[in-house]
């Protein structure tokens, strides 16, 4: 999967928008981060220049299981490690699993918006 295929998949989910929220930070890596939102909440982000991994939200028990199963799943970069995983492209996580994990992350955020005060 390449960055454009990944972006198209994320944007195919209902109500998803995208934004590069860090245009003025000092480090280049963070400036190139593209976040995918449902409502006003992130469910996934990726560096569009390096395209080495995506960071996705997971249930805590799922995060632990995925890290044990795949070398390409690590604790989430710059995120709460209990709920977020970095999933590396072109390692041992098949593209079909990456898409499923993105969809699960999306559903988690949609559920949390419905339960809480987050706008959809």
Regions found by a protein language model. Name each.
Residues 1-120:
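Charge-dense, helix-prone N-terminal extensions
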């Amino acid at each position: 999967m390449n960055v454009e295929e990944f972006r198209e998949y994320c944007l195919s989910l209902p109500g998803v928008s995208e934004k590069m929220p860090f245009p003025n930070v000092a480090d280049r890596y963070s400036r190139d981060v593209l976040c995918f939102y449902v409502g006003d909440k992130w469910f996934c982000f990726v560096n569009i220049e390096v395209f080495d991994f995506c960071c996705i939200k997971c249930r805590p028990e799922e995060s632990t299981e995925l890290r044990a199963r795949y070398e390409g799943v690590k604790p989430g970069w710059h995120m709460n490690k209990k709920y977020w995983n970095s999933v590396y492209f072109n390692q041992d996580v098949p593209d079909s699993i990456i898409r499923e994990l993105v969809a699960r992350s999306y559903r988690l955020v949609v559920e949390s918006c419905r339960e809480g005060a987050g706008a959809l």
